[in-house]
Design a protein with these regions (language model features):
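Short aromatic/hydrophobic "clamp" motif used to bind/position activated sugar donors
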Residues: 118, 130
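Short, well-formed alpha-helical segments that are part of the catalytic scaffolds
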Residues: 26-33, 53-66
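N-terminal membrane-anchoring/stem segments of glycan-assembly enzymes
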Residues: 1-38, 176-177, 187-189
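Catalytic donor/gating beta->alpha subdomain of glycosyltransferases that bind UDP-sugars
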Residues: 151, 158-184, 214-217, 222-288
Length: 311
């Protein structure tokens, strides 16, 4: 095969990453905002829903308590865990009075557990700004003050932070970059999302969402997305439709998470987010669900095709 033939075969594998990188450049970061609390800093309440998160919860909670933001309230919701999560939270609460531990009432019909836990946590909040964090996240001390400053600067009713993904196992390193690459190719950089006039382009990262209390209450809190699998995406779209300002921002130096640790967790987790959650957000997705298992590994394996064809 001559040079031109090889180049033609390789072009699709070169063009897509380049196009994705160009689109991703239109992004803004928390690094642009001050790590010092603003003048007249609002009280910020952080809600951490946790169900059977003994592996992660202590690191998450302690990272929040170590925040450089002074006016902070932390509420951890022990969602009827059976793995020791409650014991860990009780121990931390005994050491630090800023931590309030809440146990929600029984899950009512028509609700998903995370949304109900967030609702129970919000009931204990006093903050003008409320942050919802997944229990498998951890943050640096400057995340909250930078997020508050970004919310003020961008006049955001909802601000969601996209952090760094920690990858441990072989399957994580194979699958996670491909899945996030697909999402990046679809949505582009943060400013493409923020400036888009289309509701279908509005997204949020449920691992870290800040809301203005007034807007959250006005729209009905998590109750408005109580039956949605991809509740974060649905919330961003509800906010947009109702005339509220949503902002996606990078926090690669402030927020990190390890979503899954095994192939089984990857399949189950992305199954919720893509296979099921897609039905909530993309019309006609049910016709494409059969492609989901291939989507997990084919992007990575496709990288082998050009070398094989070229020889």
């Amino acid at each position: 095969m001559n040079y031109y033939g090889a180049a033609a075969l390789a072009l699709p594998w070169i063009a897509l990453p380049i196009a994705t990188l160009v689109r991703a450049r239109r992004s803004r970061s928390l690094d642009e905002y001050s790590e010092d609390a603003p003048v007249n800093a609002p009280l910020v309440s952080i809600v951490i829903p946790a169900r059977n998160e003994a592996r992660n919860i202590e690191r998450c909670v302690r990272s929040v308590l170590a925040s450089g933001y002074a006016r902070l309230q932390v509420i951890a919701v022990n969602d009827h865990s059976t793995d020791g999560t409650g014991t860990i939270l009780s121990r931390i609460a005994a050491e630090d009075s800023r931590l309030v531990v809440v146990v929600p009432e029984a899950l009512p019909a028509g609700w998903f557990g995370k949304q109900w836990a967030c609702t129970a946590g919000f009931a204990a909040c006093h903050g003008e700004v409320v942050g919802f964090f997944d229990a498998d996240t951890w943050q640096t001390p400057d995340l909250v003050p930078r997020a508050v400053n970004a919310m003020r600067n961008r006049e955001a009713d909802l601000l969601t932070v996209a952090g760094r993904q920690e990858l441990g196992s072989f399957w994580e390193r194979l699958v996670q970059p491909q899945m996030f690459g697909i999402m990046l190719a679809r949505y582009g950089g943060t400013e493409l999302v923020n400036e888009s006039p289309r509701v279908s382009d509005k997204i949020a990262n449920g691992q870290c969402i800040f809301v203005r209390r007034a807007a959250y209450e006005e729209l009905g809190g998590h109750g408005v997305v109580r039956d949605k699998v991809a509740e974060d995406l649905a919330m961003a779209q509800v906010y947009f439709v109702r005339g509220k300002r949503t902002v996606v921002i990078l926090g690669l130096n402030q927020l990190s998470t390890r979503m899954y640790t095994s192939l089984r967790e990857l399949i189950e987790g992305w199954g919720k987010n893509v296979y099921v959650g897609g039905a909530d957000s993309m019309p006609g997705w049910h016709r494409l669900r059969f492609l989901y298992p291939f989507a997990l590994v084919m992007p990575a394996l496709s990288g082998l095709v050009p070398p094989v064809l070229v020889g």
